[in-house]
Amino acid sequence: GKIKRYAKSSGTTNSKSKFIPITDECLQECHFKAGKDMLALYENNFPKSDLYNGKGLMLGGSLNKSSKEKNQEGDLSAILLNEFPFWVSYHRVPDLKTALMKEWDEKLNKIAHQAMNENITSLTGVPSWMLILLKRILALSGAKNISELWPNLELYMHGGVNFEPYKKQFKELIPSKKMNYLENYNASEGFIAVQDQSPSKGMLLMLDYGIFYEFLDMEKYKKGESDTINLKNVELDKK
């Protein structure tokens, strides 16, 4: 069938951004399936969680829509927000129109006003922008920290960048002892891995999302050999 969604890849140091086709199968059997697995893993690690007694604050990118071709292109996060099942809207802040806005300053203000009076139990988004949003919410609400504003907040799901440079600031903004952090590796090309055990920082490679993996033996690669290894022949604990 015809592809109607294209996620803008961040590219690499040596290449420009690419537009990755997102099929219906990719949405359902990779990204959405991964989201369900991620939450299931969290609940397994924290069985006393009250995550679903509140709402999730989701911060994503923007989306361009072509009325003629009915195509969508933009950040993967925006495509996912736009394609979530209808029932997700009952548990999500902000509303979809605000979530997909392009003008970031106005977008952050609107999200802040919508979120500060809600019972927020989880956060999702890139750390750099999430920090800006949380600080803006504190400025508007007058609360001394995020835990005072949202006492039931317990989870931040993050990915896309190294979290270590941001961790101290998050702990200062959210001093709650029950706060948990869950890392994932979700790329435009597919959902790769998720932090499956706490407090371990390692991420579990997800193998049943329709992604074909190839690997390199680093010792041989350093010698100029570039033969790939398929998943079946991977040796554990070997670089």
Please annotate each region the language model reported.
Residues G1-S9, E25, C30:
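General structural concept
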Residues Y6-I20:
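Conserved adenylation A10 loop of the ANL superfamily
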Residues A40-F86:
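Conserved AMP-binding loop of ANL adenylate-forming enzymes
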